[in-house]
Amino acid sequence: MGVLGKLRFKDQAFKLREDAILDATARLLAAKGFDLITMDDVADEVGLSKPSLYKHFKSKEDLVTEAMIRLLDGALAYLGGLPANLGPTDRLRSLLEWVLRVRLSGGLPFLPSTSAHVRAMLTHSLRYVTRALKLHRLLDAVVTDAKRRGELGKTLPNDVILYSYYARTCDPAVEYLRVYGKYDDDAIVAHMLAVCFSGIATAATGKVAQRVQPG
């Protein structure tokens, strides 16, 4: 093997090890949350020494930020790969199904909306913010198209729809259904999609609720 071949092999091995580290980080984030995981936990999960781990990531903050960036890259790639003729609501439904299945496989951490420290950490990463804004703009356009077609409620602001949609990606009901409801992954995904896009009230109940407003 020549020098270039050895360098390529070394780069590939480094990338594979980095992917394994990020996979382990996602699992630990889902199981323990940001505040409780340590670099020791990650090293043990991957089977690396801490010095080897620090060759890839200098801190827990760097590691978690990279895991979240990889998650956004995956969502952007999935959304971009959907058929061009797929309707806007079906695009939202398909992306949410992908996110839920990734999460159920242990690959998706809870979104850090409840952690001020993690929010501040991520907003200081230009690479993360750039991707988050890009995904938000793309989905905002999808929601606007869906409202124009009458597929989503026109009286709801886009932000209300989008932030409710984002919340479904980290809804604890997913874990409750798996642990206490004993549902399999397909059933959990189907039920979560139904709640998000169809709601829990019948059409008649919804009309009554609109008429009965608090005084």
Identify the function of each model-found stretch:
Residues 66, 79-107, 158, 162-165:
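Hydrophobic alpha-helical connector segments
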Residues 94, 102-123, 140, 174:
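Amphipathic alpha-helical segments used for helix-helix packing
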Residues 62-71:
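Alpha-helical DNA-contacting segments of helix-turn-helix folds
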Residues 73-76, 122-149, 159-167, 171-174:
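Amphipathic alpha-helical packing segments from all-alpha helical-bundle domains
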Residues 1-32, 36-45, 62:
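Basic, helix-initiating cap at the start of DNA-binding domains
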Residues 33-34, 65-66, 173, 201:
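Short, Lys/Arg-enriched C-terminal cap helix and immediately downstream tail that follows
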